Amino acid sequence: MKNIHMKTRFSIFVMLALTCQILVAQTHIKVNDSNTWTTDELAPYVNQEVIFDVPIIVSSNASSPYTVSTRRLFTPTNQAAPNTTAIKTVTSLNSKGAMQLSGLNKELRCGDKIYNLKARVNSTTSLTYLDGPCTNSRAYYDTVNVRRLVNIADCDTCLLVCTSNLENYFMGNNYHSRQRAKVINALKHIDADLLGFVELECGDAAIKEIVSYLNSNLPHRTYTYISDNTTASGTDTKAAFVYDKNVLKTYGDMMVITGGAGKARKAMQIFEQKRNGERFIYSVNHFKAKSGTGTGADADQHDGQGQFNATRCQEAQAVIDLYKRLVGQREDKDILIMGDLNAYAKEDPIRKFLEYGLIDLHRSFHADTSYSYQYGGLAGYLDHAICSPTMYKQVCGVIGFHVNSDENDRYTYDKSSDQTMFRYSDHDPVLVGLRLDGSAATYDPKPEINNLEIIRGNASHLVIRDAESTDEQISYYAIYDISGRPVVSATKIESNMESVNLPDASGVYILYVYYKAKVYPYKFIVP
């Protein structure tokens, strides 16, 4: 056996494959890949007790029974482009991978893993809990129900940018004091240098209140906001900017895009970092929702993108057009586009940004695993962080802070007197760390690895060595075929000797390892 030698600190080499199993009395059901396992395999065990020795993951916790699976279930258009074979595969695997688990008298968050689950199989899609499981966490959760925020801007020169959908923050809300307490507790915990909001009441009253409470709760901050001269009107909401004026200053006036949904839901502002004079464009947006009844091109095309997709595409183009105009005027290409775009990662509006040459930071840093929103037991990200190639070189991290989407909605301000930050909105805030002097630890979107060497022999899987995840940086691997179709979706690297089963079908494949904010591709052949 011979190692692949890389310039990085981890290596990939070939070993014999292992399999996961479900234990049923003395009978084993082999689960070679949790990402493709289907509930059809439970058919022989209906009315029997089983013990799962693969972790079972909670996909929906809105009510009992919980929806669970051997994998995290994602919205199809978050993982694959509309009208493709790949999206049909994701849709099929979602429907065949979900089970209903009843009888579990324990509050779990979406994404929680249940180890050693003992259950009665009522049908191929229905289980009844029989024995106490041991839960363990994905990000921001552990066995004592603590959600942690990873610091992605941990240097003196870094900026932390946070964009959040505030889920209709209105001064006249009957539960406003509860909502305000939850929002302020969350923003206080995040402690960002620059904040962008959507679903905030038009006018100055709501944004002024948030700034006042933040300054009272964070004495080291001196936040201020940008007035847009709007007035409160019914249910109208806007995009808004809040920044620490000791850290940043505005350069020029705020620019509002009035087309599409709402009059003030898309805005751009150039900011300058005071310590070094570096500038960048910050774009905060709230695109047209998928709900409602569209007509013509805005009608539901039944491709997974919902209503008003054409309008969202027009909104994306309007953002690009304003950016192009600013580049022509200011000669600065650095832009960070954020907000609730009401489009998942592979949908047409996001494709417009990528085809223009911009970069999806969620995808770059976290492969296929990012999410900011849950709907119908499926995760995905409507809340984006997209940037130009010049900005990309200055990004030192991006995360969705899962303080909302994974939570049971009984914590919402209108259903509970709870005033913690948990479930302050239905969307997770998205955080981006920036180092505007250009020295951020980022990577080329298409890097090359030299000095690779491998002897395959008859081996049936790869091993990724020394790239295990840490609390500060989660590592993943994914496998794609030569046409770009995902074969193994992004999987967290849990150990320093991570086993990766090779695909069954012959062909050429690409293994991507996402490690320490870099991505490393490795091409291999299954004979």
In which residue ranges do the predicted regions lie?
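Catalytic metal-binding/acid-base residues of hydrolase active sites
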Residues: 167, 201, 288, 341-344
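Structured beta-strand-rich core segments of catalytic domains in phosphoester-bond hydrolases
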Residues: 200, 206-288
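N-terminal, active-site-proximal structural segment of metallo-dependent hydrolase catalytic domains
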Residues: 125-237, 295-305, 311-321, 332-334, ...
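Metal-dependent phosphoester-hydrolase catalytic domains
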Residues: 31-33, 44-47, 52, 110-117, ...
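Bacterial Sec-dependent N-terminal signal peptides
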Residues: 1-27
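C-terminal outer-membrane/trafficking sorting elements
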Residues: 445-527
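Extended non-catalytic accessory segments flanking core domains
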Residues: 25-164, 168-181, 189, 216, ...
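Active-site His/acidic residue clusters
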Residues: 275-278, 284-309
